[in-house]
Amino acid sequence: YNGATGSVKALQAAMLPDGTAMAVYSLDRSETGDTSDYEIAYCTVAADGTPGTAMLATCDSNLDENPQVVAANFGSVDDRFVIGWHSVRDGSSDIQLLAVDGGGTMSNSFPGSLSALTSSGNAAVGGDFRFASLSGDHRSLNDLTIVWNETVNDANGAVDHGILKAAKLRYATNTYTLSAPLELAELPDRTLADHF
């Protein structure tokens, strides 16, 4: 889905091991393209196809865009969806976070944003971020990796090329942390990563 028509502007999906699926999407509630009226919503579908919870995750006048979702294991039999989206609040860019179980219930113990996980209160993760796929033996919350693109300017100040970066979410003893950014790849001159 490319978000070109209708009020749904972005759509991503994930599935828990039991077959419960979730779709997350940004919704243009203005129907005029006013990005301050974009909201993030999600819905669940049981393994047998029964529709589950449909919920707005945001309802504000801030930019909320680029919803992402991944299924992660939070412990022995505790599988949940992790939702993330780019937001701009009071001029500050951040990645908002939400953990939701298969029944659609939001967690009240999961951090609300990446900036809440850093000592400085700032997380320099680009708005075009993605969650890396989790599968097999690497589905733990400690395997959750966020990937994004940063641009490098040339000597004249014009955008020249991109660098792909990643950071890993860590959980231990009731504390969530975000690793320092790691450079995955620097693209050649005059090359940008539109899709990764």
What feature does the model see in each segment?
Residues 1-196:
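Extracellular, repeat-based ectodomains that mediate carbohydrate processing or recognition
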